[in-house]
Amino acid sequence: MPDKQTIDKAKKDAAEGKSPSTQAGEFVHDEIEKIRQGEHGARNTKQAIAIGLSEARRAGVKLPPPKSGGPELKKKAKQDEERAGKPVSQTRSRARRKAVKKEPTSTVSSEALSKQAKSAAKQRSASDRSKAAKKAARTKGPKERSQAAKKAARTRAKNK
C-alpha cells in the first residue's frame, strides 16, 4: 500500500489540475525508492514502473488501463481500481516479504532507469516528443523555462 505522503502528493497534483500520469508519477517514484531500500522487488525496470502505476490505480488515480496488453492486463487494472482502499491479508503480506528478499535492486539503478526512459522515448514520434516538451515548458516558471531552453540548445548542438 502506498504511503500517506505519496497519496497526499498525488492529491496535491490533482488539486493543481495536473494530469493523471503526473499524479501516478508520485507512486512510481515511491515504488522505485521502496525497491532501492529492499522493501519491494522487481525483475526489471518496466515491472517497477507497472507496480507504481498499479498502486496509483488502487489509490484512486484515474489512470486508463494500458493500451498495449491483452484483456488479462486490462482485467488486472480494473481489479486494482476495485481493490482501492481494501485491506491486505496477513498471509499474502508474509509471502510478499519472503519473495522480496530474492529480488534484485539493480533494476531501479539510475543507469537502468535512464535506459528505460530512452527506449520509451524512442517509441514516440519526434512531433509527439516536441509537443510534450512544449506543454512542459508552459507549466514551468521563468527560471525553469530558461534551464529547459539551455538544455534543449545543448541537445540540438550535440545532435548536429
Q: How should these model regions be labeled?
A:
Residues 1-160:
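A charge-rich, low-complexity, intrinsically flexible signal that marks solvent-exposed coils, linkers
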